Amino acid sequence: MNTMIKAGIIGASGYTGGELLRLLVSHPDVSLELATSRSLAGKPVASTHRHLEGFLDLKYENPGLEEIRERCDLVFLAVPHGTGMNYVPELLDGSTKVIDLSADYRLDIPVFEKIYGIKHSDPRNAVYGLVELHPEAAREYFVANPGCFPTGAILSAAPLAAAGLIDIAVFDSKTGISGAGISPTETSHYPNLAENIVPYKLTAHRHRAEIVQELTRLDGNLRNISFTPHVIPTIRGISTTAHLFTKEPLSTEDVRGIYEEFYRDKPFVRLPGGVPSLTAVRGSNFCDIGFEADKENNRVVVLSAIDNLVKGASGQAIQNMNLMFGLVETRGLWTPATAP
């Protein structure tokens, strides 16, 4: 690009905001213009994100939306669910582009209101920013970044769903503690989680709605979709096991052919063979996928691994940003994981 993208982050003090800062500070086409926090205004950003010491000298601000719009070409919303809709209308009242990392615009409005129990105040549409399924994000000014669990689950099943081969889909996902956010909860409190696995919201997790929405867009006849999450005692990563019961028996070779074709030219989806590892994707924007066919039971077991803060959140947002500004989608993101 001839000019730098002037980017701002609203809600920069949490894990997602911090990961946006970490990735953007070294992006060759981005100038970080502002990072907002109402409670930390005036304090150095590096005072809360210590790993960024020496990499940026920004201080937290709390400017009005008109000023943010005037200063930024792009704004990332890293705010709680139910608050993104309070920012979007004014931010989009001009040429500023917006990527919303909250859930506010991911779902159809009636579904959102039912799942989140919040009355939606801004019924505009956004592209669901899972680039591997929605390349049209490149033409948009407003993108709804997908949730972390749905990213791993949808990518694990999309090729078979698009082929119309799935009868029943059952997703079992395990996430690191950072998925619960920066404020401790009962499930993320160390004494409760150490040497433990904590399942929660066994049949009614709100991310199921995104999984259903996207897989049924690929196959309108697919209706039997289940999802159960667990928290595990690691900091980053989501490991998803998808039990995909198929309409006809498939071999592992059949599955590999379908997945290789579907993800051809999708640089952030890798099919390395074997069982995907969280350590192989930690700190990166990759989604690693493995699979094995259980031909006797018309079942395909698909495994996916992502970093919940990168491909599951901030990295995926930057992948969308790259396309929205005419850049190669790997720009600033093509780095290996931090294994071990």
Swiss-Prot record:
Subcellular location: Cytoplasm
Catalytic reaction equation(s): N-acetyl-L-glutamate 5-semialdehyde + phosphate + NADP(+) = N-acetyl-L-glutamyl 5-phosphate + NADPH + H(+)
InterPro entries attached to this UniProt entry: AGPR_AS, AGPR_type-1, NAD(P)-bd_dom_sf, NAGSA_dehydrogenase, Semialdehyde_DH_NAD-bd
Annotated active site: C148
GO molecular function: N-acetyl-gamma-glutamyl-phosphate reductase activity; NAD binding; NADP+ binding
Principal localisation: cytoplasm
Source organism of this protein record: Methanosarcina mazei (strain ATCC BAA-159 / DSM 3647 / Goe1 / Go1 / JCM 11833 / OCM 88) (Methanosarcina frisia)
Group of enzyme by EC: oxidoreductase
Official protein name in the record: N-acetyl-gamma-glutamyl-phosphate reductase
Cellular component terms per the entry's GO annotation: cytoplasm
Pathway in which the depicted protein is active: Amino-acid biosynthesis; L-arginine biosynthesis; N(2)-acetyl-L-ornithine from L-glutamate: step 3/4
Chain's gene name: argC
Gene Ontology BP terms: L-arginine biosynthetic process
Key words, A-Z: Amino-acid biosynthesis, Arginine biosynthesis, Cytoplasm, NADP, Oxidoreductase
Annotated EC: 1.2.1.38
Family classification: Belongs to the NAGSA dehydrogenase family. Type 1 subfamily.
Superkingdom field: Archaea
Purpose of the protein: Catalyzes the NADPH-dependent reduction of N-acetyl-5-glutamyl phosphate to yield N-acetyl-L-glutamate 5-semialdehyde.
